[in-house]
């Protein structure tokens, strides 16, 4: 089983309540502050990669954002988010797809990923993801990528991860991406454990 295994994630999202997964956040404060940092506007096209049942989409809709897409490998995760939002779910675009093979249908201003990329432990999978990033993010746009930090957990949801910092992501993303912010975050799980995250924000310049 790998982090790119759809069955694993469907099982997670159908067997556990929203607040029973380690990555649950009532409000994604770091992501929201970084969106503010990069000057996100309500009409910006934003894609949340591996968004699952995250509440980021709720917060963006609350703030008046009108072009929000949520991509996840697990249709069950997206269904959970849609059920939570009810009628409001129609205001977002829901994409059940693999970030390594998905063909972005438009050019996004902001590419957000909290804890999806770090599940890609294979160099080929990482490169496939970066190819989609290159196809999907507009030049001048921003990529906000949250991963476990170098001193963070080695596994999540029972699966191995690759821990990153801004330097390791820069090497993978290439010279077309410039770091504009790098910060650590101690995420507290619903049961009180602390997971060390690293959020790296890039501006695409080429």
Kindly give the residue locations of the regions a language model identified:
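Class I (Rossmann-like) S-adenosyl-L-methionine-dependent methyltransferase catalytic domain
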Residues: 1-106, 120-136, 142-206
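Conserved acidic residues
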Residues: 109
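A conserved beta-strand element that flanks and buttresses the S-adenosyl-L-methionine
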Residues: 112
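Short catalytic micro-motifs in class I SAM-dependent methyltransferases
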Residues: 115-119
């Amino acid at each position: 089983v790998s982090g790119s295994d759809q069955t694993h994630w469907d099982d997670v999202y159908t067997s556990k309540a929203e607040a029973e997964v380690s990555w649950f956040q009532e409000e994604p404060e770091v992501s929201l502050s970084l969106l503010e940092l990069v000057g996100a506007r309500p009409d910006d096209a934003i894609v949340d990669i591996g968004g699952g049942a995250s509440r980021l989409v709720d917060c963006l809709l609350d703030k008046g954002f009108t072009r929000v897409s949520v991509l996840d490998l697990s249709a069950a995760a997206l269904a959970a988010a849609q059920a939570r939002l009810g009628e409001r779910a129609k205001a977002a675009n829901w994409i059940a797809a693999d970030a390594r093979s998905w063909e972005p249908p438009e050019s996004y201003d902001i590419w957000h990923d909290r804890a999806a990329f770090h599940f890609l432990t294979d160099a080929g999978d990482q490169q496939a993801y970066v190819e989609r990033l290159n196809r999907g993010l507009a030049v001048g746009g921003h990529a906000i990528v949250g991963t476990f930090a170098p001193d963070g957990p080695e596994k999540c949801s029972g699966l191995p991860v690759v821990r990153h910092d801004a330097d390791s992501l820069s090497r993978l993303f290439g010279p077309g991406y410039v770091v504009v912010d790098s910060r650590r975050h101690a995420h507290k799980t619903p049961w009180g454990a602390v997971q060390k995250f690293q959020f790296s924000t890039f501006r695409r310049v080429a």
